[in-house]
Amino acid sequence: MLRHYVIALTLSLGLLTSTVTTAGVGNDPYKYFFNETWGDFREELANAKQQNKKGILIFFEMDECPFCHYMKSNVLNQPEVQAFYRENFLNFTVDIEGDVEITNMEGKVTKQKDFAFLENRVRATPVIAFFDLDGNRIFRHTGKTSGIEEFIWMGQYVADGSYKETSFTRYKRNKREEKKK
C-alpha cells in the first residue's frame, strides 16, 4: 500500500513540475517578435514604409527589469502575438542603460540611453512606444500589459487608427463589452 502511495505521489509531483516549467514556453521573442536592426531608426522607417507596415514599435527595456522579463516570457513569446505584430509593425528593443550608438528618427546619432531618457522620457521599464511612418510617437504604454489579449488590443488600437479618436482605456472597455455579447 505504501509503495502505491509513493508511486502516485512521485507521478503527481512529476506532472506538477512539468506543468510549472512549461507555463511560459513559446517562441524566442528575440528571434520571432523583434526584428534585427543595425540601430538606424531613420532607415527602419523607410523599411517599414517599403513593407507597408503601420509603423514601428520600440520596446524600451533594461536587463534586470522583472516586468520586461514577464512580457518576454509570457506575451512576446506567443505565436499569435508574434504573427500580429510582425504583420503590422517593425519591432525593436532599446536598452535604456545602453551605450550603443544608434541613429534616431531624425538621423541624429545618439546612445541608446540618451535616446530613451532624453528623447523619449523613459524613466521606468518596460515602455512600449509606437511610432508612425514619419517617426512621430503616436502611442506610449508604460509597464507590462495584463496579458496576451491586452497586448494584441494595443497593437490593434494603433494599427486601425483608434488612437486618433479614443483613449486606450476606453478602447479596451469597448473590446471587453464586445466579447461579452
Regions picked out by a protein language model, each given a short descriptive name:
Residues M71-N77:
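N-terminal cap/lid subdomain of alpha/beta-hydrolase-fold enzymes
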Residues D63-Y70, P126-A129:
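C-type cytochrome heme c attachment motif
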Residues S73, V94-G98, K181:
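Glycan-processing catalytic domains of CAZymes
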Residues P79-K164:
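Thioredoxin-like thiol-disulfide oxidoreductase module
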Residues L11, T19-D40, A46-K49, R121, ...:
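Non-globular targeting/processing and membrane-anchoring segments
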Residues Q51-P66, N91:
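Short active-site neighborhood of thiol/selenol oxidoreductases, capturing the structured segment around
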Residues M1-H4:
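Positively charged n-region of N-terminal signal peptides that target proteins for export
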